[in-house]
Amino acid sequence: MKITLPDFTRAGVLVVGDVMLDRYWYGPTNRISPEAPVPVVKVDSVEERPGGAANVAMNIASLGAKSRLVGLTGVDDAARALSAALSGVNVQCDFVSVATHPTITKLRVLSRNQQLIRLDFEEGFDGVDPEPMLERIQRSLPGIGALVLSDYAKGALATVETMIALARKAGVPVLVDPKGTDFSRYHGATLLTPNLSEFEAVVGKCKSEADIVERGTALMQQHALSALLVTRSEHGMTLLQPGKAPFHMPTQAQEVFDVTGAGDTVIGVLATALAAGNTLEESCFLANAAAGVVVGKLGTSTVSPMELENAIHARPESGFGVMSEAQLIVEVKKARQRGEKVVMTNGVFDILHAGHVSYLANARKLGDRLIVAVNSDASTRRLKGETRPVNPLLNRMMVLGALEAVDWVIGFEEDTPQRAIAEILPDLLVKGGDYKPEDIAGSKEVWANGGDVQVLNFEDGISTSNIIKTIISGSGKN
């Protein structure tokens, strides 16, 4: 499917559901406890992230959309940490505080990128007065493009039938990430997004795609659903709609590090794209691409427009071309296993010219694989002025990816690619011009990893700025 990203800033999405705080304790394990046969983790860092429905809201905000969140919390430090983290990423919180219950908290202990144990601090919110939640939903419905109901069976969606009815009456599509086996609670929803295990718990074991289609179609009819999206892990996703052919999407994940919160990303991106004006099929395609990015990260994570742009134009099946940073890290790992030397460079590459081509060819000769990191449009404007870039990011990346010398192309939002370089850690970092190696962004990280940094010369007299001046002069403009 050919698709371009919509203007997510036009979208407004309301998320209602079970909010929670995800806590992560990280540290090395070098010995077994003398008290019991368990590893001892020496905790050296702690992290807190919004989880559950709050992670859905963060995924929406990370795309630049207007994200509003309604949920239940306690009156405690976890609630304050949750509110602070969400407000910091432009999620508008409208929580109902319940003094008699603690905020749901999940504590995960990790060592060497492996989760050792999870501890849950919760009582659930069953029996809490639903009226404050319903009032907040009613107040928020005008002006939003989609309602997401994120159900973790903790009590926030005790009156989910009423919530769906309110939204449908207001003409707002309702997307539900379900929980449990009683899907009758979601009667009349626009879309349900169960994973395969949740789906089979309701309809029985499916031995083939034909079973999924047949039983999914019956489920839609039974509960008056407008659509059903079954997420199927390594088998991708299947979208079912009454009267339409099934829409199967293969997975875009290159390597899975952590599936925590992947379902939150799917429904968050899907709802945002739908609210921004995409069709349901297009929205599912974008959600599938986003899931492929986020499972390559550790812990509950979000996806940025840049990562999504890279992912939907990637060629993961070939292992080369334009791709996301997460996909690139996987490919670089494979290249090193093959004994290949990885070279990396960066730039704006606005109007590609002979000087660029010569420089990139020379950089490629210094190793076996060449990565080109490209400034985003916003980054280019900050560096070059409001009239630049002439060519948008996707066009620049696609042209670079077509060059014989270039193996991989990624985009980055920052003014420099230092963060990306620190993540990728090439064997050789190359920069064109009259830089000193120690002044090149990312040089310290590459040296610390045992790599090298080298400066190459550009061809004299050839530059994008000069080309633009020549074009303007030739057109008779001053």
From Swiss-Prot:
Gene behind the chain: hldE
Lineage: Bacteria, Pseudomonadati, Pseudomonadota, Gammaproteobacteria, Enterobacterales
GO annotation terms (biological process): ADP-L-glycero-beta-D-manno-heptose biosynthetic process
Region of interest called Ribokinase, as start-end residue ranges on this chain: 1-318
Oligomeric form and interacting partners: Homodimer.
Species in which this protein is naturally found: Erwinia tasmaniensis (strain DSM 17950 / CFBP 7177 / CIP 109463 / NCPPB 4357 / Et1/99)
Pathway as given in its UniProt record: Nucleotide-sugar biosynthesis; ADP-L-glycero-beta-D-manno-heptose biosynthesis; ADP-L-glycero-beta-D-manno-heptose from D-glycero-beta-D-manno-heptose 7-phosphate: step 1/4; Nucleotide-sugar biosynthesis; ADP-L-glycero-beta-D-manno-heptose biosynthesis; ADP-L-glycero-beta-D-manno-heptose from D-glycero-beta-D-manno-heptose 7-phosphate: step 3/4
Catalyzed chemical reaction(s): D-glycero-beta-D-manno-heptose 7-phosphate + ATP = D-glycero-beta-D-manno-heptose 1,7-bisphosphate + ADP + H(+); D-glycero-beta-D-manno-heptose 1-phosphate + ATP + H(+) = ADP-D-glycero-beta-D-manno-heptose + diphosphate
Protein name per its UniProtKB record: Bifunctional protein HldE
PANTHER family for the chain: BIFUNCTIONAL PROTEIN HLDE
Single GO term (MF): phosphotransferase activity, alcohol group as acceptor
NCBIfam families named among the record's database cross-references: cyt_tran_rel, PRK11316.1, rfaE_dom_I, rfaE_dom_II
